[in-house]
Each structure stands twice: as C-alpha cells, then as structure tokens.
C-alpha cells in the first residue's frame, strides 16, 4: 500500500382535524387492485390511481391560516415492489380544488406538484407528511407550506441502503435503487395525470437534503435516461416519462466518485476532525470500528439513526486525530483534484474558464472565494455580525477578502480522509454501493487502488447511474429547466467545490440555476421555505 504506486486517474402528523370519506382509511392500506398472494414479491399492484377511495379530509394551520386538504396515503407506485412500504407514496391535494377553487392563482389544472423526498445518509426515505412543526422547529414543514401555497404534494417513500426485501434477508435498497424509485414515482404521477383530481404533471418540482439533495439533483439531471430502464422495468414502473420541471437541492452529497478529492482540496492540512453523531450511531449499528474509541461512551445512542439525523447532523464534541495513513492519502487526494476540475472545462457567468494549477490555486479557487465573499457580504448587508469569522476580512463595512487557507480550521473538519470512500469500507456511501448481501464496496479509483487487497469495486454502471455529472449536457437525458442549489457557508459534510461544480455544469449546459451559499449555515435543508416557494412560484408562473 505505497502511495507512489497510486495511479491518480480519478411523520407522524400533528393534531389533525379529520373526517373519514369514501372507504374507511386504514394506516396500512395500499392502492386498490392488489392480487393477494402469500409472497409480497408475487403481488401485482395496480398503477391506476382511484381518487374516490381511501382518503381523509384533514386540516392544519400555517401562520394562522387553516389549510384544508385531502390525504391519500400508502399508494404503491410500482406494480412489483421489492418492499411495499418503501415504495409507497402519499398524495395531498388542497381541498379548494375539489370545488374548482383557486389558491395563489393556481387552479386544479395548473397547480405545481411538489415532490419532496425524505432520504438522508443514503438511508430509506419515509413518505413526508404535512406538519405544523418542521425539522428546525420554527414553523410548518415544506409539505404543509406547499399545500398552503396551492401546490399538490406527492411524497414518495424511497428505498435506502438498509431496506430489506420480502425475505427479510436480501438488501434491496442499494444503489441505484433510490433514483429508480424516485423516477418510478414521477412515472406513476404521469400515468395518472387524467385520474389525479389536481396537479400539473408538467410542473413537478423535486426537493431533498443531503443524500436526498443529491437524489433530487440526480432526478433533475437524468430525465428519461435509457440506462435506468432495466431497473424500472424490474419493479414494474409505469411506462411514462420521468423528466421533471425543476429540482431543489439542499447540500447535495453528490459526485461521490470525486467528492474525496474536493474535500481534501479544501481540508488538507487540518488533521483533526469531529464526526457527526449520526455517523457514530451508524458505525456502531453496523458493527464497525468507531474512531477515537467512542463506542459505548455516554451520549452515543445505541439505535440506528434515521434519515433526518443525517439531514440535520449534530457534531460530536470529541476531537479525533487522523492517522498517518489518512494524512498521507489526504495529500494524494488533494493533488488529484486540479486535474479533475480542469477536465470539466467549466466557465463562470462571464464565460471565463475556471481552472486550477498543480498547487491547487487558480480561477476555480477564486470562484469559490467569491461565493463565500458574497455570502458574508449579504450577511453584513442584513445587519449580521461576521466578526467571529476570522477568515473573513472586512474593511469599512465591506467584505474585501476571505482566507481559504484559514477557513478549514475555522469551520473544522468533519470527516477523515478519504471522506466518502473509506479505505476500510466503513462509510455510509460504501454501504450504499454495497451488494444484496450487504457487503460494502469502493466507488472511487484512488481508494480502490490504495486499498487493493480486500475491498471490491462497485461496477462502473452503478457508479455512473449515481452521478448527475454523467448525464448533464450529454444530449440524451432530459435535464430539468430549473435548479435551486444551496450549500451552507459552514457546511463541512462535503466541500462547496462539489456543489459549485454541479451548479456550473448545469449552468454551462443552458440550465437556469439559482446557486447560493447561505451565511453561517451548516448541513441542513428547508431552512428558507419562503424563499424556496417564491422561487417555485416565479418559475411556474413565468410566461
């Protein structure tokens, strides 16, 4: 294992006002026309939505406004699910549309369809529910706000890396299952465009955070790509298009096969780290070694984390020192990043080529600096104090520079090198690329070359299907017309460079991209819902 031998090729709902209508609603109900057999894998489910069956009329309050809606739950969106619960969808429709009413200038025919996913940490995503309390505890969640704005909400459950099949043994949610399910849910909606009481299936907007943000971006980038067809056919997805109108992506953990190099380009030289609590839980739950000997210590929850824990991580207070091997490979990864950036031939808004020299400096680095400067300046303009950020230089009330060399120590490192494709195959991402018998795999060239004795490499097709960069601008897949991408200024789950590369690639391919790094924001999503829905309104109502 010598470095010189490397080839650098790189919800529960809240209080409800409920009246039962149609057939009595049951918590475990699924869509009609299931052929009953002893085995779930042999059951065939109808793909035809029936608006007259199994719904409840409910209401909740948003900012003093009573929001009434009809709820259809547990709708199986494929005909041959690998796991029924993980491949079911909730659909919520504003009540006004059943009386031909209008909300926010939308009618039942023009209402956008908001399609959030609950994926985090590449774990299964539960079907979202409207709630008066969001993940941040400061108001309604995205699903309920969407309903208040007149949107139809279609919230699919999605398989993740821990999803088991009907036999209780086979892992059926490994890559690329999550994107296959998200596409299948879109196809279900299109299949039922004339059966749904409301919603414009040409105005579907995805939304997700962290791994869910990556999933949302992947859905937006890969519309109708033929490479996914065998997987969609296997689960009995509707034979329809799966391109969408717009994609909202919070802190996407994406471009995984290059994310390690970007992380070390940013954090190389910082040799201590603070893991997220959900990562410690995840390692302990899978029987993996927990760095720093934290296994079993007070405060480490014994149960497996859920997706929301990954989407809103809490950092451990224990500082862990990187090993000599991790420090060594950090430099290897850092040195590999410029070649990758230069291969992309990215350009900024003015058409300037963004590149890096072998030392890691160059116009791409300046572009990243500008994003942080814009974030800090906007904070200053809103009257916020940025003086605690030692890496930001302010003169006469204006941000004049940011020190990218000082930023990593100030933000702190969350992950040891490699951040994603661990040499010991211990990361959530290694698990995501694992086999049906739950054997984790490598997915990046450098990690595989460095650890070549025991770890198996995921197949190249699966790796391709998980990275939107392989489809944007390829002339074959249909990319969403609009993207909104957010990456917090102190998010260190992945490097801002990775999110910037995604945004630039989309922008260079003619996509309308709204990309921003909010000040003092870590790894999280749905924290700016008024701005999110103003953006959706602006693109949906544009003439």
Please annotate each region the language model reported:
Residues 19-34:
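Sec-dependent signal peptide cleavage junction
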Residues 33-108:
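Catalytic-loop region of hydrolases
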Residues 342-465:
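Long, low-complexity, polar/charged, intrinsically disordered or flexibly structured peripheral segments
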């Amino acid at each position: 294992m010598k470095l010189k031998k490397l080839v650098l090729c790189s919800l529960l709902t809240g209080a409800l006002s409920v009246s039962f209508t149609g057939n009595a609603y049951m918590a475990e109900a699924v869509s009609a026309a299931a052929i009953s057999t002893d085995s779930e894998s042999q059951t065939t489910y109808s793909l035809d939505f029936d608006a007259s069956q199994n719904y409840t009329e409910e209401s909740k309050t948003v900012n003093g406004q009573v929001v009434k809606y009809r709820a259809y739950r547990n709708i199986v969106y494929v005909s041959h699910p690998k796991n029924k619960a993980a491949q079911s969808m909730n659909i919520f429709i504003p009540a006004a549309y059943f009386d031909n009413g209008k909300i926010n200038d939308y009618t039942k025919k023009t209402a956008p369809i908001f399609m959030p996913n609950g994926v985090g940490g590449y774990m299964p995503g539960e079907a979202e529910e409207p709630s008066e309390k969001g993940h941040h505890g400061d108001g309604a969640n995205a699903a309920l706000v969407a309903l208040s704005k007149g949107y139809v909400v279609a919230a699919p459950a999605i398989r993740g890396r821990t999803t088991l099949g009907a036999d209780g043994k086979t892992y059926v949610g490994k890559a690329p299952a999550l994107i296959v399910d998200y596409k299948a849910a879109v196809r279900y909606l299109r299949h039922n465009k004339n059966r749904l009481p409301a919603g414009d299936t040409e105005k579907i907007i995805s939304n997700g955070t962290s791994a869910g943000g990556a999933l949302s971006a992947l859905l937006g980038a890969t519309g109708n790509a033929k490479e996914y067809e065998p997987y969609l056919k296997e689960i009995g997805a509707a034979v329809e298009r799966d391109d969408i109108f717009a994609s909202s992506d919070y802190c996407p953990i994406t471009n995984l096969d290059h994310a390690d190099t970007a992380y070390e380009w940013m954090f190389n030289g910082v040799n201590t780290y603070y893991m997220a609590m959900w990562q410690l839980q995840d390692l302990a739950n899978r029987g993996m070694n927990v760095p720093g000997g934290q296994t079993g210590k007070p405060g480490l929850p014994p149960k497996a984390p859920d997706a929301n824990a990954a989407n809103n991580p809490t950092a451990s207070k224990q500082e862990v020192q990187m090993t000599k091997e991790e420090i060594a490979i950090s430099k290897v990864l850092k040195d590999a990043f410029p070649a990758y950036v230069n291969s992309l031939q990215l350009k900024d808004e003015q058409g300037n080529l963004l590149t890096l020299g072998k030392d890691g400096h160059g116009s791409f680095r300046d572009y990243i600096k500008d994003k942080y400067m814009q974030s800090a300046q906007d904070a200053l303009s809103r009257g916020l104090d940025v003086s605690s950020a030692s890496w930001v230089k302010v003169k006469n009330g204006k941000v004049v520079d940011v020190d990218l060399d000082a930023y990593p120590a100030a933000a702190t490192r969350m992950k040891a090198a490699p951040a994603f494709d661990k040499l010991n195959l211990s990361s959530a991402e290694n698990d995501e690329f694992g086999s049906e018998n739950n054997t984790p795999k490598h997915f990046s060239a450098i990690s595989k070359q460095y650890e070549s004795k025991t770890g198996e490499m995921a197949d190249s097709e699966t790796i391709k299907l998980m990275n939107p960069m392989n489809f944007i601008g390829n002339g074959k897949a249909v990319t969403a017309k609009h993207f909104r991408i957010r990456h917090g200024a102190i998010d260190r789950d992945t490097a801002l460079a990775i999110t910037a590369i995604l945004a630039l690639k989309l922008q260079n391919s003619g996509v309308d991209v709204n990309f921003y790094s909010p000040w003092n924001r870590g790894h999280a999503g749905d924290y700016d819902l008024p701005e999110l829905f103003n953006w959706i309104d602006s693109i949906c109502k544009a003439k």
